[in-house]
Amino acid sequence: LLALTMKGGIIMIPLLLLSVMAIYVFFERWSAIRKAAKADNTFMARIKDYIHEGDIASARNLCKKTDTPYARLIEKGISRLGRPMNDVLVAIENTGNIEIAKLEKNFPWLATTAAGAPMIGFLGTVSGMVRAFFNMAEAGGSADISTLSGGIYEALVTTVAGLVVGIIAMFAYNYLVTL
């Protein structure tokens, strides 16, 4: 498999880098999203109890100690208590947008890899075919299948590699956006 991969030529280097980056981004984001999604079933009950008791400081402290996007939204809302309801809602919405942006960090890299890797693979296809025809022209009238095979190998290997990397990145991206 390594020998076949090496026949893809220099185009395989960016494809390898994109695949490593896509795998890293997928697992890093998957881990971050899972961590953010962990819910403490008693969190809201304790917040409500603190608020009903008038202990706003304890409610805010609980939010600050609970490292989740949900807790940060609640904390922002609590910090705006006593202000007009629209101010509270806008503050929570802004915090929600910030939290979503944090969770979606590096998603564009996966989307770009999903779209770009096949294009890079097709670039390898074109360069491989150019090489095959160049070799055939250099051989003159004595060209045989071995003269063409190096370029054709490069063309096919880079096409497959680009498609594989792109497809994996696309599925990884789509999986993450549905979590």
What are these regions (language model features)?
Residues 37-123, 127-141, 171-179:
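Predominantly long cytosolic amphipathic alpha-helical stalk/bundle segments
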Residues 12-25, 111-118, 165-169:
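Alpha-helical transmembrane segments of integral membrane proteins
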Residues 18-21, 27-28, 117-120, 127, ...:
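Residue-level micro-sites within transmembrane alpha helices that shape
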Residues 1-42, 176:
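Hydrophobic membrane-targeting segments
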Residues 7-12, 99, 103-117, 151-162:
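Loop-to-transmembrane-helix entry motif
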Residues 144-179:
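Channel- or pocket-lining gating/hinge segments that regulate access to a cavity or pore
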Residues 9, 23, 59, 74, ...:
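Residue-level signature of catalytic and energy-coupling elements of molecular machines
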